[in-house]
Swiss-Prot record:
BP-aspect Gene Ontology terms: amino acid biosynthetic process; aromatic amino acid family biosynthetic process; chorismate biosynthetic process
A molecular function GO annotation: magnesium ion binding
Cited Pfam families: SKI
Pathway of action: Metabolic intermediate biosynthesis; chorismate biosynthesis; chorismate from D-erythrose 4-phosphate and phosphoenolpyruvate: step 5/7
Name of this protein: Shikimate kinase
Species of origin: Streptococcus gordonii (strain Challis / ATCC 35105 / BCRC 15272 / CH1 / DL1 / V288)
Cellular compartment(s): Cytoplasm
Cofactor(s) needed for function: Mg(2+)
Residue numbers binding substrate: D28, R52, G74, R132
Main location: cytoplasm
UniProtKB keywords: Amino-acid biosynthesis, Aromatic amino acid biosynthesis, ATP-binding, Cytoplasm, Kinase, Magnesium, Metal-binding, Nucleotide-binding, Transferase
Amino acid sequence: MSKILLGFMGAGKTTVGRLLDPNFHDMDELIVNQIGMSINDFFAQEGEEAFRKIETATLESLLANQAKIISPGGGIVVNPHNRDLLEKNPYNIYLRVDFDTLYKRIENDLAMQRPLYLNNTREEFKKIFEARLPIYEKIATHIIDVAGKTPEEIAEIIRCL
């Protein structure tokens, strides 16, 4: 049985995942290792559709192998097939955070500049964020409001589920 950490980029999925299990499965890291380049470079060379296919195959493999903690990218919910896979999982934990907090986190994370952030204005980015919110909420079996909580507090809440 997998615990899947859902949420928009910058919500803290990777940070919390590492606290829950040092051997957790960060899907973006797995994909980068598989494709041999950064996700930004892959997006630029191959496009989002090619990335989403690899993302789906990675999710299917992790679920089939019953990975304990999985942290997918925030766009995992874009693909209807991924949503179907996620809806069958008993522990989908949505790390919910408001847009302004999230945007500041992403803006300040100079080491991890993401294509969705780089290629959109703040207003366009907010529309994408708002479009995904109801999908995260529908798929989630548990919702944790993470603003104002430390990663350690969030991890402890998840351990108690």
